[in-house]
Amino acid sequence: MAKRIIYNEQARRALERGIDILAESVAVTLGPKGRNVVLEKKFGAPQIINDGVTIAKEIELEDHIENTGVALIRQAASKTNDAAGDGTTTATVLAHAMVKAGLKNVAAGANAITLKKGIDKATDFLVEKIKDHSKPISDSNAIAQCGTIAAGNDEEVGKMIADAMDKVGKEGVISLEEGKSMTTELEVTEGMRFDKGYISPYFATDTERMEAVLDEPYILLTDKKIGLVQDLVPVLEQVAKTGKPLLIIAEDIEKEALATLVVNRLRGVLNVAAVKAPGFGDRRKAMLEDMAVLTNGQLITEDAGLKLENATLDMLGTSRRVTINKDTSTIVAEGNEVAVNARCEQIKKQMDETDSTYDKEKLQERLAKLSGGVAVVKVGAATETEMKDKKLRLEDAINATKAAVEEGIVPGGGTTLAHLAPALEDWSSTNLSGEELIGANIVEAALTSPLMRIAENAGANGAVVAENVKSKPVNDGYNAATGEYVDMLSAGIVDPAKVTRSGLQNAASIAGMVLTTECIVADLPEKKDSSPAGGGMGGDFDY
């Protein structure tokens, strides 16, 4: 396919046009009085949302060159979303402000490479300053405040997430599901829960609720298919003598063995239940090993030279209680902290070593199931459109609270960046010179842009608000919801330091790339073929 090649100023201006379009679409959502954006969908109802990165992903322009600008700034939003899970709109607004100011300097003859060096040095200085300003989270109240701000000032959501974090701990997983009612509810599962239910409904001990509840059972874990009942007989006899229930978790249990277990259960010889092992392949084996650690048992696998027919009672795991329904099983174990902690450390090391986001997610789930448990937020809403918007806000809130626990909090509402502008000005004027200093000044000018946009979305004069905030003490900022200047930490208007930091770093990175662009190679728009002639017609000709 033929390409179009554009150089110098023309190339940078084309990128700028794309960046302007995306930044404006996303910036309208910033702050407590930010507006919504409606996304048209090819199928189904339009989506009304307030989430920067989702809007950015939807924007595609007809002009290939302008679209390249959109893709570049979308990357700043996506990278911030990947790192911190929130702050995507702030990153977009910052990147846009840096690009606008930088392009003016490049057009006036400044050296783009030296400007980029100045931008990078200023960013490194600011990252250190953000670390100094951040305050560690001390109580669930601060977590609730973080969640409230990230969810678009929804206090109920903030409190719910703080409760969930309290119950499942820092390593726990908080997942979102679409609820069946109008209200948003929180459900916390203690212990390890996995998505496999009983193999046969005849294992249910509570026929009204169709649940199998086993108190203080033995747990047999194996990664093989159980086909012959003879393999199970030695274990069944040993467990029957103790009078305790037995849970079997295996790859599968085939008809003959299953029938024997069901008959024993119905006759009251042995209270037994069987469940298929969760996951596939290596992941299934890893989850079974996790369960073995949790229940203080052994995974009976031929890889370790263990056979089912030779299994003894001391190879079986134990737990306080097991609850199984048709879809899920929950094991509540206790008293094996040392081994569980060692296993958790091992999983954390694997998380540090892997580059795959998917693997990280799965390892995080395993870690949560072992260490804390799982909290499920069931999102309730009147319509599907509202449900989708709520779900995105909740996702942001969960990510923001996790980021806050990791790196602490800073005053929100664009306040921290605005207060850092004078500090950057002092530092850069003594440590930088020439065009590097101009690069630092570009960053300094951009630092107030999120605050200005928040104020403008609330109907105030952004430039006036920014100057007022700069002259006030470090923690004081502009509360756009009420139009007052307040102590942001006392008012509960906080941002995770990680969100502020990663937004700034990604914005500076993209701005540097745009400023140092000298040539763009893009596809030429395809010419549409003229429509073919219909029967008795002469194509696109006028006769």
Curated annotation (Swiss-Prot):
A molecular-function term among this protein's GO annotations: isomerase activity
Top-level lineage group: Bacteria
GO CC entries: cytoplasm
Keyword Nucleotide-binding: yes
Classification via InterPro entries: Chaperonin_Cpn60_CS, Cpn60/GroEL, Cpn60/GroEL/TCP-1, GroEL-like_apical_dom_sf, GROEL-like_equatorial_sf, TCP-1-like_intermed_sf
Its EC number(s): 5.6.1.7
Coiled-coil portions: none
Family matches, as CDD domains: GroEL
Alphabetic keyword roster: ATP-binding, Chaperone, Cytoplasm, Isomerase, Nucleotide-binding
Binding sites annotated in the UniProt record for ATP: T29, L30, G31, P32, D86, G87, T88, T89, T90, G413, N479, A480, A481, D495
Catalyses which reaction(s): ATP + H2O + a folded polypeptide = ADP + phosphate + an unfolded polypeptide
Subcellular location: Cytoplasm
PANTHER family found in the cross-reference section: 60 KDA HEAT SHOCK PROTEIN, MITOCHONDRIAL (PTHR45633)
Function: Together with its co-chaperonin GroES, plays an essential role in assisting protein folding. The GroEL-GroES system forms a nano-cage that allows encapsulation of the non-native substrate proteins and provides a physical environment optimized to promote and accelerate protein folding.
Complex formation: Forms a cylinder of 14 subunits composed of two heptameric rings stacked back-to-back. Interacts with the co-chaperonin GroES.
Family: Belongs to the chaperonin (HSP60) family.
Name this polypeptide is given: Chaperonin GroEL 2
Origin species: Prochlorococcus marinus (strain NATL1A)
Source lineage: Bacteria, Bacillati, Cyanobacteriota, Cyanophyceae, Synechococcales
